[in-house]
């Protein structure tokens, strides 16, 4: 294998990435101008990550007239447009800004200086920040003059952001003040604001204020003073300031709760002429037309008459009502009671939304598979029409029902079959989704849900693959989904049933089954019925020191068939028994112009009893725009299974591969390239690597020649696939159009030679021809894949 062409391309990419060219446009005439700033941070108790974060922070404190605006493009081009004529006064302002910013980090002895290189008209300024020692918190206490406020603060002191022997920072102080404001508002003090609190500090050195005639005591105090200069400390106390409006520190209770269930903007609260009013134990309900039942409000409004006002219940009520989807806008007004100084009335104004929503859409696709779950898809041009009707309020209980009708056709382009039929397949499907905004109390307690809903999903579909087969499908899902107190999403499907009936099999399809025996164990009439569990959690850290955001997500899916509901004697001859599990982990660090994204996926399906493989609609597959991008959809695996030889008309090629086990990991480096249309379209790029494969868990044919498709740990390294490539992303803000060019570097089908490592034979001279020429289809079939997708792959 000749690796030289590929090595040349890789070397060129590394060489270009190490070189930069700076272009300066519209520079000032006959004046020195600023082309760059350098910032050096000396000292300070920072680790490597914190030091880099501080340097980024200091850069943001440059005065506007000291900033150099650089536009990067294609890794190597840097453009400076209209550089500013250099003025030393702006550098002085920048140095003062940086010194002040260090105070916010607890470095009150920090010093900032600057020097400039003016040897020619291109000026570079170097800022030197000497951090010194941070001022540490010696003690911290609350001095709130109102006993109840003092008690609330002390009860939650363990949650304080002000910690002993840590630097006193502006961020920590503001966070502590905001935390206490929330605590007070959750205990009846709804008018309390941050303006009523002040953080005070005392850093007095005793040696400078204590008078003594004892020389030994004087030496001790002087030594203490020197130590405090070397390791400065501060004593903090949080005081309450008496506000001009004394009611700001009053505690309030809820008097009456008014619900205006079909509020109109021109309604006058005191005018009830054309309003129906009903009084319940906790609410006063007013409406022009009764849209909802009373128990719906009791379940979703968590505040009650006579309760202490709590801010968290205020927002929880808004979120609960918003989640129902019945109202266009939701507003809760707080009105102080004139007769009782410590009472407030709540007026909940609910502006109704449209009860019915009708939507329609037309989809156009060019894909390796059909738009349905059916098998045997080729490279097809598809058209699909979708119609949707949603009723948001059934039975006056905010129960929503959505009807979806889909009709589609796939046109044969002749690239994967020599059939002369224009229409390759057609489909028709109907789904009905019912969402009920309530779940059983036992489920709430079991999973500690804070919000949740029940669902009933039903579907029926018909797909006709001309000259191959027909497929009818039925599915039913009943269960619950909700968000836990830790913001984890858990979905339980207590009934998870799918029935796929394969019939009208043509002679052509039967020949395919004979030529590919493994298909018989996947493509057949199947009935699955059981339960399923889905778990998802997302952790976002918007305050990561070196990035705009940092996000981790974890998903787990588990389902079974034949162990619970499957014990019922229904459709025994078609019933499939299995357990299927998969986990997915994603990690993304986003910076201003770049991002790194990582994904890991593992899934396994275990056939039970006499079954040898999962049903085809439950199996795993790899390839395509969101998986192993070096292979087409369902184009990689199983194990080390060989590629079917290429033929000019692709006659008899069937390369769809699905399996019971999938392992995959992906990593992608994303970066901005250029703005095509400001504030509308941005061109971005991404370099990526995909690693993975699929396998069978058994050898269903009991044929030793097919053992290469079976998963075995000893063959894992040999049979793993690897592809790498580069893609472009056209970011339209509301969606991302993605194109990826991916090459195969490790091929499972060649695992018996060099463990599958084989770089694609491509060089500078023939790269364009091999990627785009019609005469190189066989080369692309064996080495390369081009995909188009919407939004990011993971």
What are these regions (language model features)?
Residues 1-36, 183, 600, 782-786, ...:
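Bacterial Sec-dependent N-terminal signal peptides
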Residues 20-323:
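Interaction-mediating elements
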Residues 23, 43, 129-133, 144-146, ...:
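Flexible glycine-/small-residue-rich
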Residues 108-115, 190-199, 328-335, 489-497, ...:
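Short beta-strand elements
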Residues 149-152, 290-291, 310-558, 629-630, ...:
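Gram-negative/organellar outer-membrane beta-barrel architecture
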Residues 362-378, 390, 493-682, 687-717, ...:
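C-terminal outer-membrane beta-barrel translocator/porin domains of Gram-negative envelope proteins
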Residues 686-688, 736-742:
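Conserved active-site loop/cleft motifs that coordinate metal ions or position small ligands
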């Amino acid at each position: 294998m000749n690796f030289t062409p590929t090595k040349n391309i890789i070397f060129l990419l590394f060489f270009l990435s190490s070189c930069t060219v700076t272009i300066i446009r519209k520079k000032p005439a006959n004046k020195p101008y600023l082309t760059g700033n350098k910032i050096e941070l000396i000292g300070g108790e920072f680790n490597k990550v914190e030091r880099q974060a501080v340097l980024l922070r200091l850069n943001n404190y440059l005065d506007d007239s000291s900033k150099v605006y650089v536009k990067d493009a294609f890794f190597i081009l840097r453009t400076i447009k209209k550089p500013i004529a250099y003025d030393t006064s702006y550098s002085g302002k920048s140095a003062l800004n940086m010194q002040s910013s260090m105070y916010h980090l607890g470095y009150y002895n920090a010093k900032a200086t600057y020097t400039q290189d003016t040897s020619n008209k291109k000026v570079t300024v170097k800022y030197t920040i000497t951090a010194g020692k941070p001022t540490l918190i010696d003690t911290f206490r609350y001095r709130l003059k109102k006993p109840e406020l003092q008690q609330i603060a002390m009860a939650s002191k363990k949650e304080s952001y002000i910690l002993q022997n840590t630097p006193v920072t502006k961020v920590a102080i503001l966070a502590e003040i905001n935390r206490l404001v929330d605590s007070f508002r959750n205990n009846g003090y709804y008018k309390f604001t941050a303006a009523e609190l002040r953080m005070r500090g005392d850093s007095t050195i005793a040696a400078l204020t204590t008078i003594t005639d004892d020389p030994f005591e004087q030496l001790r105090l002087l030594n203490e003073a020197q130590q405090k200069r070397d390791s400065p400390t501060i004593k903090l106390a949080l005081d309450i300031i008496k506000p001009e409006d004394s009611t700001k520190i009053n505690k309030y209770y809820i008097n009456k709760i008014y619900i205006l269930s079909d509020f109109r903007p021109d309604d006058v609260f005191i005018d009830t002429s054309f309003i129906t009013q009903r009084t319940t134990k906790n609410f006063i309900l007013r409406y022009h037309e009764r849209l909802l039942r009373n128990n719906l409000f009791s379940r979703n409004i968590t505040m009650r008459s006579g309760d202490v006002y709590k801010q968290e219940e205020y927002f929880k009520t808004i979120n609960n009502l918003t989640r129902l989807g019945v109202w266009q806008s939701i507003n809760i007004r707080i009105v102080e009671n004139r007769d009782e100084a410590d009472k407030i009335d709540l007026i909940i104004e609910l502006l109704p939304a449209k009860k019915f929503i009708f939507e329609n859409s037309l989809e156009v696709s060019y894909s390796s598979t059909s738009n349905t779950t059916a098998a045997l898809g080729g490279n097809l041009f598809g058209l699909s029409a979708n119609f949707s009707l949603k009723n948001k309020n059934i039975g006056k209980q905010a129960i929503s029902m959505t009807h979806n009708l889909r009709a589609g056709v796939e046109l044969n382009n002749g690239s994967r079959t020599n059939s002369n039929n224009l229409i390759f397949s057609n489909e028709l499907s109907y789904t009905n989704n019912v969402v009920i905004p309530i779940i059983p109390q036992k489920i709430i307690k079991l999973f500690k849900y804070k919000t949740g809903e029940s669902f009933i999903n039903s579907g029926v579909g018909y797909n006709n693959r001309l000259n191959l087969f027909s497929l009818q499908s039925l599915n039913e899902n009943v269960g619950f989904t909700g968000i836990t107190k830790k913001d984890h999403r858990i979905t339980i499907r207590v009934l998870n049933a799918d029935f796929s009936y394969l019939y009208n099999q043509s002679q052509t399809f039967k020949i395919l089954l004979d030529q590919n025996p493994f298909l018989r164990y996947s493509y057949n009439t199947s009935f699955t019925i059981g339960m399923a569990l889905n778990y998802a959690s997302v952790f976002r850290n918007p305050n990561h020191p070196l990035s705009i955001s940092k996000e981790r997500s974890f998903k787990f899916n588990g389902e079974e068939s034949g162990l619970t509901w499957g014990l019922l004697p229904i459709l025994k001859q078609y019933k499939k028994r299995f357990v299927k599990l998969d986990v997915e982990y994603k990690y993304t660090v986003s910076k201003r112009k770049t991002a790194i994204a990582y994904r890991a996926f593992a899934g396994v399906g275990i056939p039970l009893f006499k079954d040898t493989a999962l049903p085809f609609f439950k199996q795993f597959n790899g390839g395509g725009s969101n998986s192993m991008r070096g292979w087409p959809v369902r184009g990689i695996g199983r194990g080390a299974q060989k590629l079917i030889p290429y033929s000019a008309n692709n006659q008899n090629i069937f390369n769809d591969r699905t399996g019971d086990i999938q392992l995959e990991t992906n990593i992608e480096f994303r970066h901005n390239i250029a703005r095509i249309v400001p504030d509308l379209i941005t061109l971005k790029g991404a370099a990526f690597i995909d690693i993975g494969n699929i396998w069978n868990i058994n050898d269903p044919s009991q044929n030793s020649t097919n053992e290469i498709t079976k998963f075995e740990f000893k063959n894992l390294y040999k049979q793993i696939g690897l592809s790498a490539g580069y893609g472009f992303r056209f970011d339209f803000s509301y969606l991302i159009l993605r194109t990826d060019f991916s090459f195969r570097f490790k091929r499972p089908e060649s695992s018996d030679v060099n463990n599958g490592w084989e770089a694609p034979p491509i060089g500078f001279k023939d790269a364009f021809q091999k990627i785009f020429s019609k005469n190189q289809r066989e080369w692309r079939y064996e080495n390369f894949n081009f995909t188009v997708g919407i939004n990011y792959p993971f």
